């Protein structure tokens, strides 16, 4: 399941995460956002606890999207160690997202390929 995060609790939730964090920025009525959420739900089902996936409604939260200068939706941002690292592009399928994460987080892709955690 993908949890909602707000401007108010963003720094606390992302900063305390022991795993990389993906944040989807979305708004109601955005068809691309709904499609991305479905792909992220599939991704969460495969990677388990090796990645935290959150979503933020930009119509209710302005601070974080403004700091990141988000101008189009959906947008997907990667955080590690509580810090913004980069945006993830090519927001089509779960496999495309995993491909972009592969060089950064080898255990994530190993989980998706084998169906069980690496190690």
Q: What feature does the model see in each segment?
A:
Residues 25-30:
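Aromatic-flanked redox-active Cys/Sec active sites in thiol-based oxidoreductases
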Residues 3-20:
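A short beta-strand-turn-helix
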Residues 72, 77-112:
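Non-catalytic, surface beta->alpha helical segment in thiol-disulfide oxidoreductase systems
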Residues 22-23, 53, 76:
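Hydrophobic beta-strand anchors of alpha/beta hydrolase catalytic cores
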